[in-house]
Amino acid sequence: MTSAATLNADSPQPVEQRTDVLVVGAGPVGLFAAFQAGVLGMSCVLVDALDRPGGQCTELYPEKPIYDIPALVSCTAQELVDRLMAQCAPFNYPILCGRRAETVETLENEHGRRFRVTTSAGDVFDCAAVLITAGNGAFTPQRVALPEAAALEGRHLHYAVRDTARFTGKRVVIAGGGDSALDWALALRKVAARVTLVHRREGFRAADASVAEMRAAVVAGEMDFVLGMLSRLDSTPDGTLIGAAIRGRDGETVLPCDELIALYGLVSEPGPIVNWGVEMRAGRITVETTAYETSRPGVFAAGDIALYPNKQKLILSGFHEVAMALRRAYRYANPDKTLVHTHSSNDAGLQTKLHVTAE
């Protein structure tokens, strides 16, 4: 699961693949599920609606310290994601980012039951089991709430940066006050004609070091900061963005603008999962607690999206849930085989895959 195995929505061709298990959600629990699938000798593919693995940990609080992961006194959320990526990298399972799982169709034949899963990017998967590790649901960006914004989306208005080259030599306005907004403002100032960061208040929800670097860059004349909110977007008759109006304490200012990047954060919603025929309660999927299987046999749920009595929303709980779920999923993928438990320290085959040797 190196970067080479991570494909985004801009990949040229949709993927068609047969796999033992499809993991929906590439946050920490989904990444550990991939590792567990590898331990069990199962084939696996992960899909995620976000443009990179890590889920909430990467998108919402990458610098947040975590203190309750076994054997780690402390680590940041991003460090945890990086460690999980490294752990499952030897299995080289593909992570398909920027695409949302849309439909789950049951396929029945003389050989048993399988599922046909399609995504928003046109991918089609034939799998023996589906494991939903979607956290609080599919994340979507908070959009610019101006009537003229919709027509500019995808052309000059962006909610993520996928290709820095398109901003080379452009006048770029970045709206937002979190880590992503500051990180991209600092990065793009090196290639854009001019970068202006716009935020509604002086305080930021970002790492102190990033805030300090941004303020130093403003003082040095490398970029601009404007206090206020987007109030209007100006464009030519053919739909080319030319300006962004900012309303601040002293009235309205129009910034010359070729490209607008709005990084207001993400909102979560169950998304298409509500149509997958699994029992849900208060936006979460109910599961039984022997294998965390949903009301639809062969479809499992783990992590924050799973609901059962005395459920604890902890990452370590999700790790346990996927370990149990995959052992039942193994039966569906290999109905003629018996899964024999082997301790990892005695599993020579696993050690070879992980490129380690027992002492």
Curated annotation (Swiss-Prot):
The cofactors named for this UniProt entry are: FAD
User: What GO annotations for molecular function exist for this entry?
Assistant: ferredoxin-NADP+ reductase activity; flavin adenine dinucleotide binding; NADP binding
Task: List the disulfide bonds in this chain.
Answer: none
Is-annotated flag, keyword Transport? no
- Kindly list the positions annotated as binding FAD: D48, Q56, Y61, A101, F139, D304, S345
UniProt keyword annotation of Ribosomal protein present: no
Which PANTHER family would you find in this protein's record? Answer: THIOREDOXIN REDUCTASE 1-RELATED-RELATED
Entries under HAMAP family matching the protein: FENR2
Specify the protein name.
Ferredoxin--NADP reductase
In its UniProt entry, the species of origin is given as Ralstonia pickettii (strain 12J)
